[in-house]
Amino acid sequence: MHSFDVALLTDRRYTARHAAEGDWYLRNILDDDRLLQAALTRRGLTSVRADWADPEVDWSRFRCALFRSTWDYHERFAEFSAWLGRVERATRLCNPGPTVRWNGDKHYLADLAERGVPVVPSRFLERGSTRTLAEVLAETGWDEAVLKPCVSGGARHTYRVNRERAAESQSLLAALLARESMIVQPFQADIARTGEDTLVVFGGRYTHAVRKVAKPGDFRVQDDHGGKAHPYSPTDEQVELAEHVAAACHPVPVYGRIDMVRDNDGRLAVMELELIEPELWLRYHPPAAEAFAAGVVAFLAENS
């Protein structure tokens, strides 16, 4: 007998039921989760928030475990990977385990490119590689680039580098490659000028969008680094691309977020596809919570 239908997965930092005065970060998380929980309740589903890493949780009590704000997983990736294997034997994961494993490593961008999705060009440097940054930039012709881990979030170890000072950045790259695989991408000037547009999809269908803008003098649009997000009305071209990306996933995800920019040649290109624990800004467009809940109902019906 299941005690609850849905576990909304968070991490230990965000398990409080109420945000302290001035804690806008937790307040945003709770606002989004409450919108989703209310929509689930209207469809007859019970739900509770739970720390994914809590060893006391009996996951067999839930019909499914739904990823929401597990924002420390990339810092505990080995632990998280082992947890996935255990929990998917006890309950259903949403999005499913294979999708989570695929999307947890930025090598997925190469798969999307092979499936005809326009993505920002990427070069992968595997852990232990001795390739230099100067070699990569010379080979690609990129004057400026962004360096980040293949398994990451919140702009962890994300650096803007350039060809002129590549030698100075090499010790940093070497230290990172000693621990993990890295991705190098050309710096996209449109991020600094305009920002990054983020489109949300449920069951492959677009619902709403935001524009993320970096603070002056920075290129990182994450709120951890002073970035801001605002409601945004995307173009038809952007909506078409977002739904094309969702259709290129196998299976089509229950929920997802597609981050895109105008690349340095003026073409629309995907920066990231977030299928594990994306912030979805339901509070900016509450009807999206209804689409999300409907997707969870359909997921449970298909996987009962």
List where the protein language model places each region.
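Phosphate-binding site of ATP-dependent enzymes
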Residues: R156-H250
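Conserved N-proximal alpha/beta basic substrate-recognition cap immediately N-terminal to
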Residues: D11-E126
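ATP-dependent carboxylate activation and anion-phosphoryl transfer catalytic cores
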Residues: D236-S304
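Rossmann-like NAD(P)H-binding beta-loop-alpha module
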Residues: G116-A145
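Short amphipathic alpha-helix with an adjacent loop that forms part of the alpha/beta core around
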Residues: A53-F62, T132-T140, L173
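Extreme N-terminal starter segment of soluble prokaryotic enzymes
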Residues: H2-A7
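A short beta-strand motif that forms the metal-chelation/ATP-contact edge
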Residues: F62-F67, T198-V201, R267-E279
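Glycine-rich phosphate/pyrophosphate-binding beta-alpha loops
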Residues: W71, A155, K215-P216, E274-Y284
